Amino acid sequence: MKRWQACQDLRSNTFEDAALTEHYEILTTLGQGTFGEVKLASHLVTQTKVAIKILPKSRKNSLVQPEIEIMKSLDHPHIIKLLHIIDTTRNIFIVLEHAVGGELMSRIEEFGYLAEVECHRLFKQLVYALQYCHEKGIVHRDLKPENILLDHRGNVKLTDFGLGTKIIMGQKLVTFCGTLPYCAPELFEDRGYDGRATDVWSLGVVLYFMATGCLPFNGYSYEAIKQKIIAGKYPRSFSLSPELWEVIAKLLTVNPGERPTVHDIARFKWLKPDNEASPASLGENIESHPDPSIMVLMGVMGYNPGEIRESLREKKFDQVMATYLMLKQQSAWENKTTKKPDPRLCDRMLRSTEPTIKNQTSVRRASSVPTHSTFSLPNESESLEKGKRTTMSHSMPPTRNCFNEETTPLHSICPQLVQKAHYRRSIWGETEISDTSEESSTGESLEHPSLKIHTLQTSMGVSKAGSTYSKSKGSSQCVSSHHTSVEEDQCEGTNISREINPPLSPVSPQENLMGQLHIVTTAGSMDIMNTQVTSPPFSRKEAKGEGPALQQRESRPSSPNTLQGHLHGRRQTVPQAPFQRRVWRTLRNGLIRGLRTLCCCLPIERRVHPTNNRDLAVSQKSHGGSHGIRAFRGTVLPEK
């Protein structure tokens, strides 16, 4: 008889194992409990790790079926998900979601206690999970760190609803159940209690234990612990924030009627900083709206779409539904682990494309074309570092700064950006330049192309101090800078155009090196031209506005044709004077030298010393008589 029974048990165990191993591969044992054991297994189709709770069918496990029904009705990100149920003659295999992070108790024992920030995060997730259960009329009745698991991201997963039950509004429970240190005071009274209030008390004990690493009600005997719980006295010698102590005090209120509900807890000040709403379920509305991508994938595996919908609609929790839920879970993990763009970087990229008034160091690309030509207002402060001189530049409103009216379009001036300042005149050496251009005494005038002098908004113009510019000059002639007076009285959507014919500068090259640094960019060139030759600053009268004095940057004229791209990224060279002008200058200099040798004996009344070593003829009249005199290079001749 005993031998026959042993054979029957062997056949039964073989059948039981086959029902399980047909879909899962057992890996190891996770734990052993009073009612059964938990195995770690791998799903053969999706290779998903799962936890399988093996519960033998017996009178002791009369609560297995209520737990299964509760798990079937729960679908929340912070609650362990039921995946598959295998019911055999001897055992019930409950396939659950596997939380790789282990128990919360192990985490607390490892670190002693948790930081308040971590307590805040985990406690909020617990509140959301418990709020979801209470809304469905389910009470846990065994909240403790051993029944709180952590997933691969460290998030809470509430598990073990073996002592849980479903209640209706106003229903009282009479069964004493739970773990003693986490039991509420009303459980020790001989009357009914509210299951929701007991869960809130246990939640307060868990929060206290996370923040301190100690149980609030502890003792060496059952009676000692019971008396402390009924009295509601617990140590407050730990260094916690006042807000956290306030939450603990409200949760551990002895009177269950004065104890807050989970909805009240969610509105506590300690839980409100991040304004995070309760997370949605991962499997919400899967019965009526299955994921199309998962349906296609399961179709490739050989599953019938109609069978999939039927299994989800009726919540069979069979092999078909288990495969769908595992694929859904993997899809959710992939979406969370996918790297997304950083909002702060995008914000910096967006801000980098917008105009700003802050001084920043930036690089102008060769492909970026300035929309408006602008003046530059450099700061007076300059720094010298490692042979480099840097100047900070500010941007002025877009104004027209061209010398050729025919080739340069007009630019409208925005009234909001115009800084009203009137620069009446500029002093350059001893020569005064008025608002209208004047020709020099030699009658020489140069044709200048349209130059757009502008600065990089929010950037620094950097020029090297040295002989780089002098080497790049070659045979080019020294050309004076062109200064214009800016009048911005008409700012309301008007176009300003001015034709400027600059005079020839009498300043020597030695004096020209004493000016400020500047940046010159032409209409066709996109690169920054770092130059060493500079111009003296403007002096202004009756200035309207604030800021440093306007300092015009020196420019070197070039042919208009070359401005369209032939000199892209290169320095401009100054064209030589016309051939007839050079011949006339040579003849004139020879004539002056001949007259000087012939008339050396005449009395000298005044000599002229040009500052720029150029041959200039100055006409003057005599102070004492009616006859004028003509002076050539310090030699006075009688006027005819």
Curated annotation (Swiss-Prot):
Could you tell me where the Low complexity compositional bias lies?
470-481
InterPro entries xrefs: Kinase-like_dom_sf, Prot_kinase_dom, Protein_kinase_ATP_BS, Ser/Thr_kinase_AS
Q: What is its EC number?
A: 2.7.11.1
User: Protein kinase domain location, by residue?
Assistant: 24-271
Catalytic reaction(s) noted = L-seryl-[protein] + ATP = O-phospho-L-seryl-[protein] + ADP + H(+); L-threonyl-[protein] + ATP = O-phospho-L-threonyl-[protein] + ADP + H(+)
Q: Where is the active site?
A: 142
User: Which keywords label this protein?
Assistant: ATP-binding, Kinase, Nucleotide-binding, Serine/threonine-protein kinase, Transferase
Instruction: Specify whether Phosphoprotein is a keyword of the entry.
Output: no
Chain residues that bind ATP: 30-38, 53
Q: Which residues cross the membrane?
A: none
**What is the name of this protein?**
Sperm motility kinase X
Look up and give the organism this protein is from.
Answer: Mus musculus (Mouse)
